[in-house]
UniProtKB/Swiss-Prot annotation:
<dbReference type="InterPro" id="IPR023738">
    <property type="entry name" value="Maltoporin"/>
</dbReference>
<dbReference type="GO" id="GO:0006811">
    <property type="term" value="P:monoatomic ion transport"/>
</dbReference>
<dbReference type="InterPro" id="IPR036998">
    <property type="entry name" value="Porin_LamB_sf"/>
</dbReference>
<dbReference type="Pfam" id="PF02264">
    <property type="entry name" value="LamB"/>
</dbReference>
<keyword id="KW-0813">Transport</keyword>
<comment type="function">
    <text>Involved in the transport of maltose and maltodextrins.</text>
</comment>
<feature type="site" description="Greasy slide, important in sugar transport">
    <location>
        <position position="393"/>
    </location>
</feature>
<comment type="similarity">
    <text>Belongs to the porin LamB (TC 1.B.3) family.</text>
</comment>
<feature type="site" description="Greasy slide, important in sugar transport">
    <location>
        <position position="99"/>
    </location>
</feature>
<keyword id="KW-0732">Signal</keyword>
<dbReference type="InterPro" id="IPR050286">
    <property type="entry name" value="G_neg_Bact_CarbUptk_Porin"/>
</dbReference>
<feature type="site" description="Greasy slide, important in sugar transport">
    <location>
        <position position="252"/>
    </location>
</feature>
<keyword id="KW-0406">Ion transport</keyword>
<dbReference type="GO" id="GO:0042958">
    <property type="term" value="F:maltodextrin transmembrane transporter activity"/>
</dbReference>
<dbReference type="GO" id="GO:0046930">
    <property type="term" value="C:pore complex"/>
</dbReference>
<keyword id="KW-1134">Transmembrane beta strand</keyword>
<feature type="site" description="Greasy slide, important in sugar transport">
    <location>
        <position position="31"/>
    </location>
</feature>
Length: 452
């Protein structure tokens, strides 16, 4: 008994050491931003995004607290074979109070198995909810190739001349399909699952320090037996992507060309939309004239072109630069599309290895296909920043900023009660829209941003 008791502390110590080693193996990654801001005309910080654009220039122009908390662990390894479990929970609040409750978004929960298929060395099979090979422009927080969601696939199959990846994911629309419920009337509504099938070929050597990635995405509405889509709904579509990445000046330049059809045009990033329905509504003009806007599904029949160039480079020891230029044209058969182009730069001057000054200048211009009118906005931000390193990507960062924006909006989306419809009208038409008119504003504040 004495021997057993004497061995007990050693056993406890060994067990504690094993559990500690296991606990230390957990990977903790994430992203967060938060701050406080004011508006020159009074009140809390306003943020500026031109009506019709899908994103905005983000420096000194983010009005929410947002966080992604990722926990993952390699749960099994034998030789070069392994299983990795990954999760991600995201939060977003308006940063107005100390206590702001919100429902978290469970954005990732997946398992990735590496080198499990003997005859496909280096490949990874996976299943679950996942951020899947996302492509974005950081300075405008714009994701131009992103099929994230619940799914499964195999990636990084070595073909010798490039890496092949295959995946299937899903995104669901509310109220998109209908079935007979009573008296032979389609009045029972069910959400519609939109499936996306993705094929990518990456790592194609094109020139010194240059690689090409090609991709094809097919998305379609997958209705349940006994249900049907609303007449005229966009049922499917394609998206084709070619992206050339050039390593240069201690950074990179990416040139992207994308073409999409029908259901793949709304979001323009690889997820299908078009099975959802919308109700008719009536708009009354100041003179009493009433205009009826008929029931119209999210009919996305048409096409989208996007040409994009963006990058981040170093210009000597003291300067860094982010930049973006993009043209996007969504041409729909129902005449509700838009033409959007944007250009912006964010130079960084490094006073010390941990202190810098940033200047972001961005311009957006959006034309309504329905009205022919244009909205435009200039946005300028000057920020003084302290960051963990001398790269334009160094984080965490704490910055103080001042932002000025001037806009002139000639059109807006027509209001349907508390909602915004997909119909557009000129600002001077007398119809109630979400157009901001012709004005300007400035804001100032402080913000932290971190990824790890």
């Amino acid at each position: 008994m004495m021997i057993t008791l004497r061995k007990l502390p050693l056993a406890v110590a060994v067990a504690a050491g094993v559990m500690s080693a296991q606990a230390m193996a957990v990977d903790f990654h994430g992203y967060a931003r938060s701050g406080i801001g004011w508006t020159g005309s009074g009140g809390e910080q306003q943020c500026f995004q031109v009506t019709g654009a899908q994103s905005k220039y983000r420096l000194g122009n983010e009005c929410e607290t947002y966080a992604e908390l990722k926990l993952g662990q390699e749960v099994w390894k034998e030789g070069d074979k392994s299983f990795y479990f990954d999760t991600n929970v995201a939060y977003s609040v308006n940063q107005q109070n100390d206590w702001e409750s919100t429902d978290p978004a469970f954005r990732e929960a997946n398992v990735q198995g590496k080198n499990l298929i003997e005859w496909l060395p280096g490949s990874t099979i996976w299943a679950g909810k996942r951020f899947y090979q996302r492509h974005d422009v950081h300075m405008i927080d714009f994701y131009y190739w992103d099929i994230s969601g619940p799914g499964a696939g195999i990636e990084n199959i070595d073909l010798g001349f490039g890496k092949l990846s295959l995946a299937a994911t899903r995104s669901t629309e509310a109220g998109g399909s209908y079935t007979f419920s009573s008296q032979n009337i389609y009045d029972e509504v069910k959400d519609t699952a939109n499936d996306v099938f993705d094929v990518r070929l990456a790592g194609l050597q094109t020139n010194p320090d240059g690689v090409l990635e090609l991709g094809v995405d097919y998305g379609r509405a997958n209705t349940t037996d006994g249900y049907k889509l609303v007449d005229g709904a966009s049922k499917d579509g394609w998206m084709f992507t070619a992206e050339h990445t050039q390593s240069m000046l201690k950074g990179y330049n990416k040139f992207v060309v994308q073409y999409a059809t029908d259901a793949m045009t709304t979001q323009g990033k690889g997820q299908a939309r078009g099975s959802d329905g919308s109700s008719s509504f009536t708009e009354e003009l100041p003179d009493g004239t009433k205009i009826n806007y008929a029931n119209k599904v999210i009919n996305n029949n048409g096409d989208m072109w996007r040409i994009l160039d963006h990058g981040a480079i170093s210009l000597g020891d003291k300067w860094g630069l982010m930049y973006v230029g993009m043209y996007q044209n969504i041409d729909w058969d129902n005449n509700l599309g838009t033409e959007w182009w944007t250009v912006g730069v964010r130079p960084m001057y490094k006073w010390t290895p941990i202190m810098s000054t940033l200047l972001e200048v961005g311009y957006d211009n959006v034309k309504s296909q329905q009205t022919g009118d244009r909205n435009n906005q200039y946005k300028i931000t000057l920020a003084q920043q302290w960051q963990a390193g001398d790269s334009i990507w160094s984080r965490p960062a704490i910055r103080i900023f001042a932002t000025y924006a001037k806009w002139d909006e000639k059109w807006g989306y027509i209001k349907d009660g508390d909602n915004i419809s997909r119909y557009a009208a000129a600002t001077n038409s007398g119809i109630s829209t979400n157009s901001r008119g012709d004005s300007d504003e400035w804001t100032f504040g402080a913000q932290m941003e971190i990824w790890w």
